[in-house]
Amino acid sequence: MVKTVLILCTGNSCRSQMAEVLVNHDLGPDVRAVSAGTRPQPKVADGAIEALKLGGMSTAGLYPKDVDAVMNEHIDLVVTVCDNAKESCPIFPKPLPAIHMPFHDPHGEPLESFVRVRDEIRARLIPELKQR
């Protein structure tokens, strides 16, 4: 059975989007990631798109989503990737296991910062999810 992981942050424009793509790329088909934000931005950050493309990953169909849009999906685990999302994490219809794994927010920084965060997500989050 496929495990579904919700990756949650505030804007759903940088870290959670990169984490969604990395999890689906590295752990699919056993794990399916979806991402959302507590206050989603209008679009995915250009730096996040570029960092993912540089890593050879598809960015087709990425867009910021409000956590309410995924609230009724089957979720096995919630991963918060920023402190604000942890603090304002919504109450789900059923209790869910959750982990908090914060990453630096590269929004507004050079592409190198996005690449660094992408690599850190891969180095820390992927092994954690493999163990679960």
Feature map (PLM): residue ranges:
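Phosphate-binding/catalytic loops
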Residues: 86-132
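Structural signal for conserved beta-strand scaffold positions within catalytic alpha/beta enzyme cores
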Residues: 35, 80, 99-102
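Mid-chain, well-packed structural core segment of small domains
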Residues: 62, 68-93
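Alpha-helix boundary/capping detector
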Residues: 49, 77-79, 105, 124
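Conserved small-residue
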Residues: 12, 52, 78-79, 121
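Conserved active-site segments centered on acidic
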Residues: 1-68
